[in-house]
Each structure stands twice: as C-alpha cells, then as structure tokens.
Amino acid sequence: MDVQPTTMRGAVKTAHLGTDVSLATKPLPKPEWLRGKSASTPDVERLVRILRDNRLHTVCEEASCPNLGECFRKGTATFMIMGDVCTRHCPFCNVAHGSPHELAADEPVNLARAVELLKLSYVVITSVTRDDLPDGGAGHYGACVRALRDLKRSLKVEILTPDFRGAVAVAFEELRMNLPDVFNHNLETVPRLYPRVRPQADYHGSLDLLLRFREQFDHVPTKSGLMLGLGETEQEVRDVMEELRRHRCDMLTLGQYMRPSPHHLPVERYVTPDEFERYRQFGLSIGFSHVESGPMVRSSYHADMQARELMLVN
C-alpha cells in the first residue's frame, strides 16, 4: 500500500534515523538578510493554477524554498517530476518519504504544456529519488527532455538529478539520446557530515557521478551545490570545492541551510554574506565558470544567469 506524503513528513520521517533533531534545540534567531518576500501575488496564483491544471509539482513548494516568492513572481519554477514522495529520508529535506506511486505516463507532455503556457526559456527539472526504479528514473528524465525539445523553439534545459545509486551506467544510456544543456547533481554537504545529513548517500559516489557524466558527454557542463550552516568548517568547504574542480565540475551554488521544521536538522550557524562572497571569489580563482554564492541561493536559483557564463543562453 502506498504511503501518503502527509504521513511521512517531519518527526515520522526522521524518527528512525538515529539522528538528533531534538525539539529541545533552541533555534538560532534568523538574521535580517534571510527575510524572504511574500509569495502571494496574482502572477504567483496564475503559475500555481497552471501547475495544478497539469498535475505538476515544483521543488519550490515541496522543499519550502525561501526564494519561492521571488521566482514565482518572475514566472520561473523548478519542476519536480516522478511524484512528490521520495524513497529516501534525509533529515534536512522537507520532501515527503514513503512508497512512491507509479510514474505518470503523461507527465512529460503536461510539463511541456506548462512550459509553453508560462513562456519559459530556461527550464530546470529535478525529482525525488526513485530507488524503486531500475534506472533510477533516468528514462523519465529523458522523456521530459524530449518533450521539451519537441516544442521546437529556443529552450535550454537543466536537470538536477539524484545519484542513480547502483544504476549509473543504465541511467546514462537512458539519457544519451536526450541530453540536457546542464547536468546538475548536488553534493549538499562536506564528507564528514554525510552520516548525519545524507545517511543514505555516498559522497564519493556523487563525485564519481559528476565526473563520469562529464567524461561521457564532454560538451555538457556539470554543476553541483552545497548547503552551509550544518557544522562544516571553512577549510572543509574549500576542500570540497577543489575536489569538485578535480572532478571537472563547471558551476557551483552555495547557500544557507534553513530548517524546514523543528523535526529537521537544526541550523548550526548562519553564514554571513561576506563569507559567501569569499567562497565565490575562491571558487572563481580555482576555475569554476560561475559560482552563485549567497544566503538565499539554492541550486536552481538564477540558473539561467548561471548558465550564461558558458554562453548557453542568448
């Protein structure tokens, strides 16, 4: 029996991980630079209506992204395919965990219709992790990219994928005929914190995924992202940035982790805008084509502007 998303959020989702997300943890006061704008405007309501009419989800809503208001007002969104229930239960993430439903065969067509209605020129597609599928859902990613290409207009597509654990070779074969313009896979945090932050993932496996994609599809740039404020040190962040460059990663996003609820990992520290700027400058100095670094940055925030650094967008 499928588990409904609402039954596997918050405390129920993270209780069995053995990770301390105690309600007794007093939250740090949020600094002024992290105050987002309200998402409620007529333009936002129109976008939400189009998404609902086409039975689509956005990671903006599911992950409680702090930029939801800004991006929705600009008519952009990161589409989350393959449902809104994830087979993993990372204690930093607000997406529901459970047994996912079957893939919706009409989702690629619905996605293309929504993109056309919204008149988007740069589309980001991400997904829940689907360990239940033999190819990790790569074939569905490919079908969505193909549907967007069929629109026959100038449109750039970025995919932000899971790690395709145990199925990387199969996944790449599925993507081969429908490659994106940018391949994005987030490391999320430094290796020392993986047992606490990403207990079902493998740091070196994620690095290897980025390198293998770049080696097989050399003309497609790669991208990754980190959340800061979970207890990492500055040297650890710099080490990861250097390791990403050694694995031929082209673009990087760095943003502040923000706790979705009291049942998720607490924020250990709010990183200042000046620190984010230092990371940006360091990233550029070691060869990243673009580093989007700031408290409110998320992996698909200003994705079109990030890609311009590689002349992907007119």
Swiss-Prot record:
Residues 72-289 form the Radical SAM core domain. This is Lipoyl synthase. It is found in: Cytoplasm. Belongs to the radical SAM superfamily. Lipoyl synthase family. Its main location: cytoplasm. HAMAP family: Lipoyl_synth. Binds 2 [4Fe-4S] clusters per subunit. One cluster is coordinated with 3 cysteines and an exchangeable S-adenosyl-L-methionine. The lineage of its organism: Bacteria, Pseudomonadati, Thermodesulfobacteriota, Desulfuromonadia, Desulfuromonadales.
